[in-house]
């Protein structure tokens, strides 16, 4: 494994998107409060706080486990940083500093911030991988709900202010970036996995995820116009289903029972929006079932909206949005098939043992038990 300049630049771009997303959300929430739209302001701020709190819980949990593994006991300092919501920024500082020394200074430094002897390339890759997992959490816990909320607010009033447009654009960029960056980090940190080489595999994967996600979020927005309670009940049902699926698969990502429970809650929430392999096993059947349900759900929502009185919604937007939903879903499924049929790194690899059963030569790394593609 080798940490490259490309990996370093991806980390730099990652923190730029992270900070921009955070600032845009705060500015928009202030704008809502200033305009007297208190419900939208509270919801916008709540999504930000909820996402960052959960992300920092996982960040501190991982750091605590790493410190205990290294025999260190200086965790109170890091606990304070995470309580002040500075854990992610601290991780970025160490990751960028380490990455800079590795790729530009060609440092042979062998100790990290835990005073542990380690290979600098491995250290830089592990730090970047932890950040990619945290960004993935933040994207689906905060970015996706935020995007649905802002699209709903935009369609309800028929126009968007600059802050709203900024949040929508940054959320789309954050979702796109974190999705691709996570796949690159996943395969970079696990030597037994084939790398995602070239531009086309990354583009196919990005379009598959982004288009299916866009189609579903627009469908949810339409359902919110029909009946907010029905939309929330549907999302709750899907979350519970994903939560139960995580329990059935006996995920083993966290060391503590409480954090594993929280992890399964988050996995259930992520599965509301997109599919991930939560146990590293063959996913052909689960993925087929998932997107079959997604297609049926999307068509059902469009059917309900067509027969519902259009007085609740600006009809000028309905036909373009309906066409966008159908086209995005169709193209997303096509890109899914193209990616797994022609560009997936494991498409020509002989079937092997389950990646999480520990019977094959593997490097001990927490991402091995995280969400796969």
Curated annotation (Swiss-Prot):
Protein family per UniProt: Belongs to the XK family.
Tissue expression from the record: Highly expressed in the small intestines; weakly expressed in the pancreas, liver, stomach, and large intestines.
GO biological process, alphabetically ordered: apoptotic process
Gene: Xkr9
Membrane topology according to the record: Multi-pass membrane protein
Name of the protein: XK-related protein 9
Membrane-spanning parts: 8-28, 38-58, 166-186, 206-226, 230-250, 256-276, 295-315, 318-338
Reported regulation of activity: Activated upon caspase cleavage to generate the XK-related protein 9, processed form. Does not act prior the onset of apoptosis.
Transmembrane helix recorded as keyword: yes
Protein location: Cell membrane
UniProt-annotated site: Cleavage, residues: 357-358
Highest rank taxon of the organism: Eukaryota
GO cellular component terms listed in the entry, alphabetical order: plasma membrane
Keyword Transferase: no
UniProt main location, coarse: membrane
Keywords: Apoptosis, Cell membrane, Membrane, Transmembrane, Transmembrane helix
């Amino acid at each position: 494994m080798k940490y490259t300049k490309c990996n370093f630049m991806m980390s730099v771009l990652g923190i730029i998107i992270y900070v921009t997303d955070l600032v845009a959300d705060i500015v928009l929430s202030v704008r809502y409060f200033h305009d007297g739209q208190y419900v939208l302001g509270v919801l916008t701020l709540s999504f930000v706080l909820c996402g960052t709190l959960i992300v920092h819980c996982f960040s501190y949990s991982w750091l605590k486990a790493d410190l205990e593994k290294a025999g260190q006991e200086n965790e109170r300092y890091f606990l304070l940083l995470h309580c002040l919501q500075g854990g992610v920024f601290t991780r970025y500082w160490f990751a960028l500093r380490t990455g800079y020394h590795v790729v530009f200074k060609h440092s042979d430094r062998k100790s990290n911030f835990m005073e542990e002897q380690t290979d600098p390339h491995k250290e830089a890759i592990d730090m970047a991988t932890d950040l990619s997992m945290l960004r993935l959490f933040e994207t689906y816990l905060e970015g996706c709900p935020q995007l649905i909320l802002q699209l709903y607010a935009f369609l309800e009033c028929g126009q968007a202010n600059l802050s709203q447009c900024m949040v929508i654009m940054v959320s789309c960029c954050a979702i796109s970036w974190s999705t691709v960056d996570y796949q690159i980090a996943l395969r970079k940190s696990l030597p037994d996995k084939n790398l995602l080489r070239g531009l086309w595999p990354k583009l196919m994967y990005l379009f598959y995820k982004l288009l299916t996600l866009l189609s579903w979020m627009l469908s949810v927005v339409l359902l919110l116009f029909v009946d907010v309670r029905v939309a929330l009940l549907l999302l709750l049902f899907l979350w519970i289903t994903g939560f139960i699926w995580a329990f059935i698969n006996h995920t083993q990502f966290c060391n503590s029972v409480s954090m594993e429970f929280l992890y399964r809650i988050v996995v259930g929430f992520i599965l509301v929006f997109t599919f991930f392999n939560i146990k590293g096993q063959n996913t052909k059947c689960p993925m087929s079932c998932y997107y079959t349900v997604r297609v049926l759900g999307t068509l059902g929502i469009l059917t309900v909206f067509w027969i519902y009185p259009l007085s609740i919604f600006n009809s000028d937007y309905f036909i373009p949005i309906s066409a966008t939903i159908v086209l995005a879903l169709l193209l997303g499924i096509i890109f899914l098939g193209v990616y797994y049929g022609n560009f997936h790194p494991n498409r020509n690899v002989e079937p092997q043992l389950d990646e999480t059963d520990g019977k094959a030569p593997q490097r001990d790394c927490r991402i091995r038990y995280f969400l796969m593609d």
